[in-house]
């Protein structure tokens, strides 16, 4: 068995980028920054073009191919949409490969070699000032972390990001509902190191963990609360779901008990093929990813409840997508075909509700009503015995396919990192 020190020694090596990679990301960043600055200046826009986020603080992971450049507007009469229009017009003239993305407002994603550079307009705000868009906080976040994140903590941030990525909870988008890069860095600043974050996380309790850098009177109702130091009315951990928080708690406990490099090496576990599954597969809609994930998680949750009402036992379910061609709902079930009859439990015989139960079923084609113990029961015919028919009844006609027992994704695989 490897010791904690031995595992950490090897793990730190995984998050140190090569000199060539560091040089390349600097070159691409500066190249795009100069271009954007030139376009903004020529457009007569009063703004500062700068790099924030992990790229600016050196907390990015090896292999990361995304860079964030911000256009910080001093003039609030200028709309982010105007900035995007000026940038995309010039990018088109130059023959560059760009795409329009959406958060609270549009921004531009520019493809440079094998890097994706997001160019995000935002407004300049002062500490404590109410932001107009979520991106407005980014310069303040950068200032706070740059002043507090020590040089020897940069590797700890990278290691924590890799740990979170491996266990599937890195990213604040709706797809993941996990820990943002900013939140990850805040945790290292607060607790001091990667291992101290894990020691603390192993003792966290949902809805009882409150981390703050500043005094605030704001009340938050989230599994995890980390008060944003640049905006005390905001919970920097608001995106973290109960499942994501609990996954980190479990991973931290197990890693501290049995350290292993598996927590830093994302991989797929082997599939358990004996279980039954059903997939509802849709073509990917032309909408922003957060919209798509939110929409299909809602559809998936409603269908999950419906399947249970129909008598299908669902072990687990999820939404999966390549964000290009498909989005699908996946259900791991006990069985995809049910027996034609089911036992239906009624009220106790001494309860007034038993009369309505008897009157409902006494003339129906059921077995019973009969009594077992103190309750009335019937054995009645199911409306749907095939899971596909049950799904069609709920979703109606639509542009989707139903696939039964063809799935071999993560929902039917062994958890590869857990020791």
Swiss-Prot record:
Positions with a binding annotation for CTP: 54, 57, 141, 161, 170
Residues binding Mg(2+), per UniProt: 66, 68, 118
Gene Ontology MF term list: ATP binding; CCA tRNA nucleotidyltransferase activity; magnesium ion binding; tRNA binding
InterPro entries (UniProt xref): CAA_C, CCA-adding_arc, CCA_tRNA_nucleotrans_2, NT_2-5OAS_ClassI-CCAase, NT_sf, NuclTrfase_I-like_C, Polymerase_NTP_transf_dom, tRNA_NucTransf2
Keywords assigned: ATP-binding, Magnesium, Metal-binding, Nucleotide-binding, Nucleotidyltransferase, RNA repair, RNA-binding, Transferase, tRNA processing
Highest taxon, organism lineage: Archaea
Reactions listed under catalytic activity: a tRNA precursor + 2 CTP + ATP = a tRNA with a 3' CCA end + 3 diphosphate; a tRNA with a 3' CCA end + 2 CTP + ATP = a tRNA with a 3' CCACCA end + 3 diphosphate
Covalent S-S links between cysteines: none
Residue positions binding ATP: 54, 57, 141, 161, 170
Cofactor(s) named in the record: Mg(2+)
Biological processes annotated in GO: RNA repair; tRNA 3'-terminal CCA addition
E.C. numbers: 2.7.7.72
Alphabetized Gene3D superfamilies for the sequence: Beta Polymerase, domain 2, CCA tRNA nucleotidyltransferase, domain 2, Poly(A) polymerase predicted RNA binding domain
Alphabetical list of Pfam families matching this protein: CAA_C (PF21133), NTP_transf_2 (PF01909), tRNA_NucTransf2 (PF09249)
Free-text function comment from the UniProt entry: Catalyzes the addition and repair of the essential 3'-terminal CCA sequence in tRNAs without using a nucleic acid template. Adds these three nucleotides in the order of C, C, and A to the tRNA nucleotide-73, using CTP and ATP as substrates and producing inorganic pyrophosphate. tRNA 3'-terminal CCA addition is required both for tRNA processing and repair. Also involved in tRNA surveillance by mediating tandem CCA addition to generate a CCACCA at the 3' terminus of unstable tRNAs. While stable tRNAs receive only 3'-terminal CCA, unstable tRNAs are marked with CCACCA and rapidly degraded.
UniProt similarity note: Belongs to the tRNA nucleotidyltransferase/poly(A) polymerase family. Archaeal CCA-adding enzyme subfamily.
Note: A single active site specifically recognizes both ATP and CTP and is responsible for their addition.
Subunit structure comment from the entry: Homodimer.
Full protein name: CCA-adding enzyme
Organism: Pyrobaculum aerophilum (strain ATCC 51768 / DSM 7523 / JCM 9630 / CIP 104966 / NBRC 100827 / IM2)
